Amino acid sequence: MEEFQGYLELYRSQQHDFLYPLIFREYIYALAHDRGLNRSVLLDNVGYDKKSSLLIIKRLISRMYQQNHFLISVNDSNQNKFFGYNKNLYSQIISEGFAVIVEIPFSLRLVSSLKETETVKSYNLRSIHSIFPFFEDKFPHLNYASDVLIPYPIHLEILVQTLRYCVKDPPSLHLLRLFLHEYYNWNTLITPKKSIFAKSNQRLFLLLYNSYVCEYESILLFLRNQSNHLRLTSSGILFERIRFYEKIKYPVEEVFANDFPATLWFFKDPFIQYVRYQGKSILASKDTPLLMNKWKYYLVHFWQCHFYVWSQPGRIHINQLSKHSFDFLGYLSSIRPNISVVRSQLLENSFLMDNAMKKLDTLFPIIPMIGSLAKVKFCNTSGHPISKSSWADSSDSDIIDRFVRIGGNLSHYYSGSSKKKSLYRIKYILRLSCVKTLARKHKSTVRTFLKRLGPKLLDEFFTEEEQIFSLLFPRTSSTLKRFYRGRIWYLDILCINDLVNHE
C-alpha cells in the first residue's frame, strides 16, 4: 500500500496546475481575450454570440448577488428585462461567460502537458482520423472488444459535484448552482434529447459533461496504468477523491464496508486499450472473456457508486474481434486475417509458406448511410435517388455547390474505407439526385438535362485528390488502382458536420 500511495501522490501532484483561480479576478477576463490561448488549443464554439461581451458578463454576474434584481416573475418569465436583455439572452450570456472563464485552466493544463511531452504538431492529434492509426497498430493484437456507452448523469447536481474536483472556488460553484436552479428545471432528468443540451447553451453543458467524463476517465485510466503495481497486493477500488488520503491511512475494507454490498477487487490487465469519442467508448483486451466481464461489472458498479448513475450490464456487449464488427466514428471496423504466401528455398528444395497476419478492416456503412440520405430526402429507403425539392428554388450554381460539398465531405471522411465500392454508390446517389433537382427546377427530364449539360456536371463531383491522381497517372495504371483501394487518414478532420446544414 505504501508503494501504491506514492503513485497516487505523484498523480495528484500533477493536478495542481488544474486548479481554478477566483472567478472575480480582473486578469481572468483579460486572459479570456487572448485569442492565441483559446483558438490554438480549444475548439471555437460556432454558436458563440459575439454580442456577449465579457464586460457585460462580469456586470451581470455581480448583479446576481443582489437578490432584488434577480427575482423573475413566473407569469412574465420570457419577457422580463434585465439590463435590456430578456431572460433567454440573459441566460445565454451567463452560461457562455461562465464557460469561457472555466475553460482557461483546462487550456493552460493542455498547453503545459504538450510542452512537457514535447509533442510536435499537436493539432494533428485533434483529428478524428488519428484514432484509426491507433486501431491499426493495437487492435490486431487484441482478442475482445466491448462497446461502452457512457451514461448521462440523471441530475444536474452530479455535474456540479464533479466539477468541484478541478474547480477549487466555492463561490463560483454556488453561482453555477444558482444559475442552473433559476433557469432550468433542477429536478428533471438529463437525457441527450433534452433542451438543456440545445445549441444556445452548448458551451456550458459541454463543459459540464466533459468534466464528468474527465473525472470518470481519470480514475479509470489511473487504475489501469497502475494495475501492474497491484499484482501482489489486493486493494479495494478508491472512488471518492476528496477523502483520498484518509482512506489510504486506514484499511480499505473498513472504509468501504458501509458503502458497497460487496468488495470490489482490482485485477491485473496490462493489455487493456481504451478509446473514446464523445459519449461512446471502446474497451478492448487481449485476455480472456472472464477479465472483460470483470471490467464490465467494474464499470457498472463504478457509475452506480461514484456518480449515482444506473447502467444495465446487459447493454454492454463483449464481442470477439475476429468474428464481430464494432461501429465507431461512422466506420464498421473488424479484425480480418491477411494470408500471404511466401516461397522459401533451402539449398535445392523450395517450399511455400502461409504467413497469416491480422489487420484492421474498416468498411463504409452503406445501409445506415442510405437511411441518412433518405431521411434528408436525397433518396428513398431503397436507395433510389430523388430530387431535393426544398432546394429547387436556389440557383443552379448553389444547388451544384451544395451537392458537391456533401459528396466531397463524405469522400474526405471515408477515405479510410477498405472497400470504396459502397462509397461510390453513395456518390452516385448524390450525383443523380443533383441532376433530378436541377431537372425539376427547369421542368425538364433527366435525360434531356444531361444531354444539354454534358459530362461537366459529373466532373464536379470528383474530389481534389481524385483529380490530382487522374492527371498524374493514367486510369489503367496500377498506381491509381492502389490509390482507389488504399486507405488514407487525414489529420485535418476535427468534427463531424451535419449532412445538410453544414458550412
Curated annotation (Swiss-Prot):
Q: What's a single GO CC term here? A: chloroplast
Output one GO MF annotation: RNA binding
InterPro entries registered for this protein in UniProt: Domain_X, Maturase_MatK, Maturase_MatK_N
Keyword list (alphabetical) reads: Chloroplast, mRNA processing, Plastid, RNA-binding, tRNA processing
- A biological process term (GO) from this entry: mRNA processing
Compartment(s) where it occurs, according to its Swiss-Prot or TrEMBL record: Plastid, Chloroplast
Q: Which family, according to UniProt?
A: Belongs to the intron maturase 2 family. MatK subfamily.
Q: Which HAMAP family match?
A: MatK (MF_01390)
Give the function comment from the record.
Usually encoded in the trnK tRNA gene intron. Probably assists in splicing its own and other chloroplast group II introns.
Q: Could you identify this protein by its name?
A: Maturase K
**Lineage, highest ranks first:** Eukaryota, Viridiplantae, Streptophyta, Embryophyta, Tracheophyta
